[in-house]
Amino acid sequence: MNIKRRLKYLTSCLLVSAFFWINSSAWAGGPEIPPSAPWVIYLGGFGGIYVANFEYQGTYLGGSFTVPIGSNVHQNGYTAGGHIGLRYYFSNPWFLGLEFAAMGNSENATTAESVLAPSPDDLIFNLVNQFRIKSNLDLTAQLGVNITPQTRVYIKGGASYARIRHILTVFNPATLTPTISLQRTTHKNRWGFLVGFGLGYDFCPWFGIFTEYNYYDYGRVGLDSLSNIRPNNGADTYHQNVRVHAYSVLLGVNLNFSV
């Protein structure tokens, strides 16, 4: 089991264990939750695991033949960012929240394909795609409850705006050492949605920690169609698209300001 899987497994176990422990102690005769300030503004930073899935589809039209291309690859990376938010206790201990977050994400997802003519021995070129969600901006609403004086659980959902980078590279296999005959980098800005849940704990009125799980879905993204991409400059067309979804597991800190 690699480090990222261990971190993901450990974080998930902590989330589940903490939830059930706090839930049992809070509702089984625990201390009465004192009134909270109606409004809480918070600033925070976080880091964690970020995994994006790219379901890539392409169609190569080579004149007299068609080659379908498809693969499913993952961006197994890390993320870091910050957020600012507002909680309103409309009926203590229940609260509504609004939050804006920004984060940057590491690593690439890479797929490599060989484009063949109808004859299995007729290799035309090798095609390599690299994908990466470089960053995303999230605006979410929250519904939560303080289950102890220091602890809260919540669900969240909203909109996410992602910047997706795509690098397409064509290699000419006819040479002794394959050479790059075409390389194209494009960026796509894409709206999507996210849903998630979290657990927060305040050590004192102004400082606390939190952990979250978030799921993102950006749908199917149309990529640029290209012409004449084969190394020998033959007439052809290449159509491509990719479906993008992701998840993150976060751990962070907050500074709280009661209003």
Curated annotation (Swiss-Prot):
GO CC terms, sorted: plasma membrane
Membrane topology: Multi-pass membrane protein
Keyword check for Cell membrane: yes
Main location: membrane
Annotated TM spans: 32-52, 191-211
UniProt KW keywords: Cell membrane, Membrane, Signal, Transmembrane, Transmembrane helix
Pfam family, one: OMP_b-brl
Subcellular compartments: Cell membrane
Domain of life: Bacteria
Entry annotated with the keyword Signal: yes
Signal peptide (UniProt feature, chain positions): 1-28
Stretches of the chain forming a coiled coil according to its record: none
Gene3D superfamilies tied to this protein: 2.40.160.20
Protein name per the record: Uncharacterized protein CBU_1413
Originating species: Coxiella burnetii (strain RSA 493 / Nine Mile phase I)
